[in-house]
UniProtKB/Swiss-Prot annotation:
Gene this protein is translated from: ndhF
Molecular function via GO: NADH dehydrogenase (ubiquinone) activity; quinone binding
Key word rRNA-binding present: no
Protein name (database record): NAD(P)H-quinone oxidoreductase subunit 5, chloroplastic
Example GO biological process: electron transport coupled proton transport
Known partners and oligomeric status: NDH is composed of at least 16 different subunits, 5 of which are encoded in the nucleus.
Main location: plastid
Functional description taken from the UniProt entry: NDH shuttles electrons from NAD(P)H:plastoquinone, via FMN and iron-sulfur (Fe-S) centers, to quinones in the photosynthetic chain and possibly in a chloroplast respiratory chain. The immediate electron acceptor for the enzyme in this species is believed to be plastoquinone. Couples the redox reaction to proton translocation, and thus conserves the redox energy in a proton gradient.
Keyword Metal-binding: no
Topology relative to the membrane: Multi-pass membrane protein
Reaction catalyzed: a plastoquinone + NADH + (n+1) H(+)(in) = a plastoquinol + NAD(+) + n H(+)(out); a plastoquinone + NADPH + (n+1) H(+)(in) = a plastoquinol + NADP(+) + n H(+)(out)
Species this protein is from: Pelargonium hortorum
UniProt keyword annotations, A-Z: Chloroplast, Membrane, NAD, NADP, Plastid, Plastoquinone, Quinone, Thylakoid, Translocase, Transmembrane, Transmembrane helix, Transport
Length: 744
């Protein structure tokens, strides 16, 4: 067995020849390489598939017998210092390797068609391959130095992919924002590594954990300094996994191509932070304050991400805030010491979120066919609707991903999320209440995304569409009924429907049920036809894009089975519990109690009930707009609803403004940090130019005039020199007499 494990170091390097050959081909044979660009997708998939098979083989070996293999090469620089490089294969490495490769293969298959017409096709596949190489190197690293090197490579290629369409100013700014925000976390991570090395004298995990544990229990190092080093290490994960308050880069990262959004949010960049905390959890366990901080940051991120997703119009940005919230669940679990639950949710969320992003990419790809390449239009959910008839496979896949993320049984995320919620009751009832209530928010905003995208009818065909929330009709698509501004104008229902149209439209006739007869009849009432031809509609995506989505549907349906919490005769029978090291599950060690069905079912009933409640609320507010018009007429009867109605509208608008403006956190950073630093830079420029340079230049000018004065006095005549000498003596005598008389 050891003979097989010693070749595991080659895993990260297997896909590396493809980007190298692409680079050589572009240098030597640029025309031919670009002409045969589609050929390069096949070796990329083949080599990544080999890595997946190798990872699966190691997974099976470790499942049969838990075995941790580490191989180290020592590079001695001098007698006092040496660097050690190696690779580590343990259950965490196997899980992450399979996750990266399976999600990566589906995304690459999808990208082959999605990026087919893009001029940067070869550049995209090169970046994607190097991204996988960096992430595989990260998860197989045996020490902190290797992790930091691969950590920086993961960040670099993610920035290149976020700013892939760098000619668009928005994409370039998003890349810059991600880079600057992660610089804060990476610098913190580097300081933590250096601090730990100064304390322990080692970068290797095994030695590091043992020495650190002894230092804490023997009080050989000040506890504050140990806590500071641990906090600095956590700072790296804080930024990389988009945890509050360094989460601001993640929504803007949606400016990159949709396949890279799927990869970043599912199994690579944001997962790197969770992996780092999981890898260093033996170190954090002996620092209770750090564990409490991790769980506190996690619960804040859970709630904040869910609330900020409530009113997003951009479909990818809504999913980005969803990722932020789900990463908060994982961080909460790690802070509680629930190692198994965190990794379980990392696995299930990866497949569900990859499915959702690929579904969103399929929708965007189809919308671009007739709205043109404009992210403001093709990604705007207010312009969508009615896609259920035109994209049935995408709709079914997206619905299953949505239900999974909402925590609806028996889909994958139900089992993992409820494991975290069940453990949260053991850790802190307050955290458990917040985490459970957030499941309702999750179900609400995810079904809001689904309903606005697929239900109803295609909204882009409306002539009086306006993206502004003050619009009289489309405020329905934001909160389910008219905004307060429309209600206060006291316009009748017929007036509302005839605004900006040449002819009035009669909606309420005797046969109201004909409203649902067909899409053409529905849109005819609102659409001004230049010709009698029907308008184009989105079409289902190509089979090359649908195949990966179907694969991810299978994972979403069945991957939850690896962690179903069976418990018989004090033996955990689920695959994940058997696979992971049991001693690291700190929470259950403290409680001296394992999770079983008697605890799981009541807690799951509560969370599922809240999820269904969120789904019902979303269905009431965001069901198809045309079916809601009778309800809108009923609302107009209560225009003069009194102060309670006005107060409710104000509260609703405050919530909407908070969510749509990202909690004003970006604005706060722009004012306090960006403008503050700019003001400080202007002040330092003024101080340097006027004060520092003023003193230097002033001394020069003073010396110049002093020299000129002396030059004028010294004309070469002896009488002038004697007169000057006599004046100086008199001045000296005068000052001396003055000091003597007044006793100074």
């Amino acid at each position: 067995m050891e003979h097989i494990y010693q070749y595991s170091w080659i895993m990260p390097f297997i896909p590396l020849p493809v980007p190298m050959l692409i680079g050589v081909g572009l240098l030597l044979f640029p025309t031919t390489t670009k002409h045969l660009r589609r050929i390069w997708a096949f070796p990329t998939l083949f080599l990544l598939g080999l890595v997946m098979l190798l990872s699966a083989y190691f997974f099976i070996l470790q499942l049969n017998k838990s075995y941790i293999y580490q191989y180290v090469w020592s590079w001695t620089i001098n007698n006092d210092f040496s660097l050690e490089f190696g690779h580590l294969v343990d259950p965490l490495t196997s899980i992450m390797s399979i996750l990266i490769t399976t999600v990566g293969i589906t995304v690459l298959i999808y990208s082959e068609k999605y990026m087919f017409h893009d001029q940067g096709y070869l550049r995209f596949f090169s970046y994607m391959t190097l991204f996988h190489v960096s992430m595989l190197g990260l998860v197989t690293s045996s020490n902190l130095i290797q992790i930091y090197i691969c950590w920086e490579f993961v960040g670099m290629f993610s920035y290149l992919l976020i700013g892939f369409w760098f000619t668009r100013p928005v994409a370039a700014n998003a890349c810059q924002k991600a880079f600057v925000t992660n610089r804060v976390g990476d610098f913190s991570f580097l300081l933590g590594i250096l601090g730990l090395y100064w304390i322990t004298g080692s970068f290797e995990f095994r030695d590091l954990f043992e020495i650190f544990y002894n230092l804490v229990h023997n009080n050989e190092i000040p506890f504050f300094f140990l806590t500071l080093c641990a906090f600095l290490l956590f700072g790296g994960a804080l930024a990389k996994s988009a945890q509050f308050p360094l989460h601001v880069w993640l929504p803007d990262a949606m400016e990159g191509p949709t396949p890279i959004s799927a990869l970043i949010h599912a199994a690579t960049m944001v997962a790197a932070g969770i992996f780092l905390v999981a890898r260093l959890l033996p170190l954090f366990i002996v620092m209770p304050y750090i564990l409490n901080l991790i769980s506190f940051i996690g619960i804040i991120t859970v709630f904040l991400g869910a609330t900020l997703a409530l009113s997003q119009k951009d479909i990818k940005r809504g999913l980005a805030y969803s990722t932020m919230s789900q990463l908060g669940y994982m961080m909460l679990a790690l802070g509680m010491g629930s190692y198994r639950a965190a990794l379980f949710h990392l696995i299930t969320h990866a497949y569900s979120k990859a499915l959702l992003f690929l579904g969103a990419g399929s929708i965007i790809h189809s919308m671009e066919a007739f709205v043109g390449y404009s992210p403001e239009k093709s990604q705007n959910m207010v312009l969508m609707g009615g896609l259920i008839k035109h994209m049935p496979i995408t709709k079914t896949s997206f619905l299953l991903g949505t239900l999974s993320l909402c925590g609806i049984p028996p889909l994958a995320c139900f089992w993992s999320k409820d494991s975290i919620l069940n453990d949260s009751w053991l850790y802190s009832p307050i955290f458990a209440i917040i985490a459970c209530s957030t499941t309702g928010f999750t179900a609400f905003y995810m079904f809001r995304i689904y309903l606005l995208t697929f239900e109803g009818h295609l909204n882009v065909h409306f002539r009086n569409y306006s993206g502004k929330r003050s619009n009289s009709f489309y405020s329905i698509s934001l909160w389910g009924n008219e905004g307060p501004k429309t209600l206060q104008k006291k316009k009748g229902f017929k007036t509302l429907l005839t605004m900006n149209n040449k002819k009035g439209v009669t909606f309420f006739c005797k046969k109201i049920d004909r409203i649902d007869s067909s899409v053409r009849n529905m849109t005819r009432l609102f659409t001004h036809f230049e010709a009698k031809n029907t308008l184009p509609y989105p079409h289902e995506s190509d089979n090359t894009m649908l195949f990966p989505m179907v694969l991810l549907v299978l994972f979403t349906l069945f991957v939850g089975a690896i962690g179903i919490p069976f418990n018989q005769e004090d033996k955990n029978l689920d695959i994940l519990s058997k696979f992971l090291t049991p001693s690291i599950n700190l929470l259950h060690e403290k409680s001296n109690n394992s999770v079983d069905w008697y605890e799981f079912i009541p807690n799951a009933t509560l969370s599922v009930s809240l999820s269904y409640f969120g789904i019902v609320i979303a269905s009431v507010l965001y069901k198809p707009n045309y079916l809601s018009l009778t309800k809108l007429n009923l609302l107009n009867l209560f225009v003069k609803g009194g102060p309670n109605k006005i107060f409710g509208d104000r509260i609703r608008n405050r919530i909407y403004d908070w969510s749509y403006n990202r909690g004003y956190i970006d604005t706060f950073y722009a004012i306090s940090l960006a403008r503050g630093l700019r003001g400080f830079a202007e002040f330092t420029h003024f101080f340097d130019a006027r004060v520092i340079d003023g003193i230097t230049n002033g001394m020069g000018i003073l010396s110049f005039f002093l020299g000129e004065g002396i030059k004028c006095v010294g004309g070469g005549r002896l009488s002038s020199y004697l007169l000057l000498y006599f004046d100086c003596v008199l001045l000296f005598l005068f000052i001396s007499s003055f000091l003597y008389l007044f006793h100074f």
